[in-house]
Amino acid sequence: MYIRTFGCQMNEYDSDKMADVLRADQGLELTDNPEDADVILFNTCSVREKAQEKVFSDLGRVQHLKKQNPNLVIGVGGCVASQEGEAIVKRAPYVDVVFGPQTLHRLPDLIKRRRAQGVSQVDISFPEIEKFDALPPPRVDGATAFVSIMEGCSKYCSFCVVPYTRGEEVSRPFDDVLLEVADLADQGVKEVTLLGQNVNAYRGAMGDSGEIADFAMLLEYVHEIPGIERIRYTTSHPKEMTQRMVDAYARLPKLVSFLHLPVQAGSDRVLAAMKRGYTALEFKSVVRRLRAARPSLTLSSDFIVGFPGETEEDFQKTMKLIEDVGFDTSFSFVYSRRPGTPAADLHDDTPQDVKLRRLQQLQALINQQAAAIAQGMIGTRQRVLVEGPSRRDPNELMGRTENNRIVNFPGVPRLIGHMVDVVVTHAHTNSLRGRVAGIERDTSGAE
């Protein structure tokens, strides 16, 4: 099987699960070459503009393979599939299966029905937690893994399609998450990333007791699982950053000193139009409390530039927020209209060249801040999880620091999958360079 993934880490996780269900049910293994595949899947993302056209363009590139091999199964999953549904088959009749993020576990049955009936199968329903109940146990090869703890979003920001493509927020049961993390730890995973559209909105049922665990409680329990040495999570929402969450940074050393906290804008007027549910001052208050609990915390964020009605004054307020807070990295884009969202109907009279100029200025400021953080790391001793050979030089190793910086350094292959101390010697634009200072034991549970 060949799977091409677009978009966020949730989609990466979903693609892994597609591979798991097809491997377990049909014995298929992954290939990097679509020409060698019996099943070709596109796991799509609808966040950016023209996502649908991108899907049909990619489908067109594999259509000839269907002509060569009529038994080939071509499928479209993800958020574009949820949005378009039957329209995908109408426009591209050679597509065999269309499925949403919540129905990927039904993929084997959809393929079987397609082969038995000779008719394209479409299932973009929202069966809530059924997806997780039907997935096979995770299989990983490496020291890091993703674990999805919830699906969907109930915030309904005016610009966002996620509530319409992934449904309302649904949390996995508390024990199910812990069992999956423990299973991954038994397979050698040392760093786990907990995933959700609004991951800190997690509210998981605790067995049959009727009690509900919040995200802070989940973090506390994951923290105690033997073998897990690092905990990350994404994506969080500022409204859900409770005091219990803030306190977790003071109590849980395995929780990394890095947080992705999307703010989107620094103007209260724009934030209100986006329906984000907080002000710039409230966002800065959250950051201040987080850094009081964990002074070493670095932040990344999301920014939308050129939202309908954004004035130059609004934009300058965003720039001021960036200057006040300081960010390590950002995902920043010019606003793109998403059909079916409330913002799609807002009047937008800002010229495109103005939007692009603002985006360039914003990215330049954050790049400047990121460079300063990188320079400040030179000479410091960083705890690094070694992930594998360096992409630049296969004779060297690559790992990540707590603040998610890639570090390349000389080392022997036996270090892969282990924590090592690395002294940073150089800072480059997108990575660091260092040398090994010492090897930590696997049994270390402290940061």
From Swiss-Prot:
Alphabetically ordered keywords of this record = 4Fe-4S, Cytoplasm, Iron, Iron-sulfur, Metal-binding, S-adenosyl-L-methionine, Transferase, tRNA processing
Cofactor(s) needed by this chain? [4Fe-4S] cluster
Where does the chain cross the membrane? Answer: none
Q: Which residues form the Radical SAM core domain?
A: 139-372
Which SUPFAM superfamilies does this entry report, sorted A to Z? Radical SAM enzymes
Q: Where does [4Fe-4S] cluster 1 bind?
A: C8, C45, C79
EC code:
2.8.4.3
- Give the catalytic activity: N(6)-dimethylallyladenosine(37) in tRNA + (sulfur carrier)-SH + AH2 + 2 S-adenosyl-L-methionine = 2-methylsulfanyl-N(6)-dimethylallyladenosine(37) in tRNA + (sulfur carrier)-H + 5'-deoxyadenosine + L-methionine + A + S-adenosyl-L-homocysteine + 2 H(+)
Q: Report the family membership.
A: Belongs to the methylthiotransferase family. MiaB subfamily.
The entry's protein name is: tRNA-2-methylthio-N(6)-dimethylallyladenosine synthase
Origin species: Bordetella pertussis (strain Tohama I / ATCC BAA-589 / NCTC 13251)
